[in-house]
Amino acid sequence: MATAPLAFHLPFPFPSASRPPPRLLPPSRRPPAARLAATRRFRPPTADDEPPEAAEDSSHGLNRYDQLTRHVERARRRQQAEQPEITPDHPLFSSPPSSGEAGSYDPDDEFFDEIDRAIAEKREEFTRRGLIKPSAPAPSQPEEEDGLADELSPEEVIDLDEIRRLQGLSVVSLADEEDEEANGGGGGVDYGDDGVPLDDDGEVFDVADEVGLEGARVRYPAFRMTLAELLDESKLVPVAVTGDQDVALAGVQRDASLVAAGDLYVCVGEEGLAGLTEADKRGAVAVVADQTVDIEGTLACRALVIVDDITAALRMLPACLYRRPSKDMAVIGVAGTDGVTTTAHLVRAMYEAMGVRTGMVGVLGAYAFGNNKLDAQPDASGDPIAVQRLMATMLYNGAEAALLEATTDGMPSSGVDSEIDYDIAVLTNVRHAGDEAGMTYEEYMNSMASLFSRMVDPERHRKVVNIDDPSAPFFAAQGGQDVPVVTYSFENKKADVHTLKYQLSLFETEVLVQTPHGILEISSGLLGRDNIYNILASVAVGVAVGAPLEDIVKGIEEVDAIPGRCELIDEEQAFGVIVDHARTPESLSRLLDGVKELGPRRIVTVIGCCGERERGKRPVMTKVAAEKSDVVMLTSDNPANEDPLDILDDMLAGVGWTMEEYLKHGTNDYYPPLPNGHRIFLHDIRRVAVRAAVAMGEQGDVVVITGKGNDTYQIEVDKKEFFDDREECREALQYVDQLHRAGIDTSEFPWRLPESH
């Protein structure tokens, strides 16, 4: 399928694209010259000020230069007394200046050598008297700077060149600026419309470009707008407004615990009403609520706004206050049930490989660009206020594109945020299990379809769909019918992007991908068939925007792992260890099916179920694991206030056992195999269970730790303590070889000690 060039808000760096407009840097990120240009005055920070010089003492009739000359003369006479062979015409000495004649300050002149000699003599005297320690011998200095480069490693030479280049930025004093203006020149420096100095090629100096994406600290913008301006610009028509409409607003919040002084608090439902007092105490200056909320009592806030539709207000107000950042960025939305997070990470890496600074908001966090993480709540991707604020921060830090996970978790049935201007819509797949995400099947489909219905401009928008999913035609038909659709498939050769050949292994995935513009050979650390689908989706996005094929491959291959998503733990062991967040019977089944395709000798699986909820799924989880794993280790996963042994009793029902029957076998330290020949063990302490399972691994096996994924906590009773499955696996792998060398049999649980013990 032919792909037309896109006309995004900020052009992509393709050969046919024009240069993007200069980006305004945060004031605190500008180099000194940039700060001068923006304010026309430079005031160095206090830490940069030099200490004031001492007042010159002229009571003896000699100025500072005359005093210095006398010191030199005394040193000259002392030198002649100690070394008579050195005469005044010796090249060591310079001719003394005649009266009234200015002395030479040439750095190469012997005048400075004599000063150094006088200082050295004084140091020797103090050393002899024991006042100071002897100086260490000075290392020999190379005569030329190139000699230093010969002694450096290639990486150090590159760093040295970078330092020299950045040292070209100098602070310009106010006097220098006035002299330049008086002479009718600007020192050869051109400035952009925003006051930022331009490079020789006309581009704005960017600190992040100079020191690398990982070297620049993220800056957070400040916003200010009166309530009256916000209501006017957002086109929100309130039912009633009481109080001061000229109150200045600095932010918007719906979570009372996040409110800061100057914020507007959006009171949503009973939960919002419960947090109203806290928001008021934290400094909320205005409150927005709907007519169903009964606000009684006296609030310290200065204004109250009543609206008909609080959901619309929740979207419109933050978009307006944060200046609608999506209008100035290329925004890619990824929707679906599975693979959304991995696909978003791959697409972002591909964009950055193209040189497009790209942010992201997803369930694993938010990023301004590169690995520069933003402060965000875990559920930020489903919060319209948080998304607008995070995108504004990305834009403020120079991001040109943004990846948004348009998952149904936290998304209302009305669909994606209508205040976000999407450019590309991507579908991974649709799997609706019962009342998933609190929606019916129709609501679930319409919610994700709302993203594709926004694709109406054939010049700017694109749809990317997985035609192996039965719902693909429904999503492709949404929005404009003339908007290009890029399809991908695992085996369907009619798709624009499809696999030609692939190979799965315990440590790597290799795939040949056919595209309309050529064949791509991709080697990835992401494991399993499902990740091939995610790779295909990313390639399809690259095709949709006309990305260079080499950048598509480079970006995808740079992603070695997605935290907690079939994440490989590699400590150079002879067997695979995978950590995944699968915590439902369906996701566990798909995970183990994918692991089976890797061709392992055995599968050892650790599963746990949370306390105080979803008791019905506990036996089902065990049944799935016992059918698709050779060895199963049952354990706890955030038992909270429920007894972990009660949870394990429920889980054992999945294989027809009770806790009492299991413990009877424990009297002989032998647990018989299940009817299918598979083994099952349990331990209520998760740390013990995870480490025991890792120790069971042998060459060719795969140990799968499920449930937590990238979560880093364990909740027991009322305590929430740090716990990371990945770190537990790495720790256990350090000792497996030692256990085996000691003759300990870790294939059973409890472990079997050698007879010598």
Swiss-Prot record:
Organism of this sequence: Oryza sativa subsp. japonica (Rice)
GO-annotated cellular components: chloroplast
Key words of the record: Chloroplast, Plastid, Transcription, Transcription regulation, Transit peptide
Source species, domain of life: Eukaryota
Classification via InterPro entries: Mur-like_cat_sf, Mur_ligase_C, Mur_ligase_C_dom_sf, Mur_ligase_cen, MurE/MurF_N, UDP-N-AcMur-Glu-dNH2Pim_ligase
Name recorded for this polypeptide: UDP-N-acetylmuramoyl-L-alanyl-D-glutamate--2,6-diaminopimelate ligase MurE homolog, chloroplastic
Family, per entry: Belongs to the MurCDEF family. MurE subfamily.
Subunit text: Component of the plastid-encoded plastid RNA polymerase (PEP) complex.
Function of the protein: Required for the activity of the plastid-encoded RNA polymerase (PEP) and full expression of genes transcribed by PEP.
Biased composition (Acidic residues): 47-56, 142-152
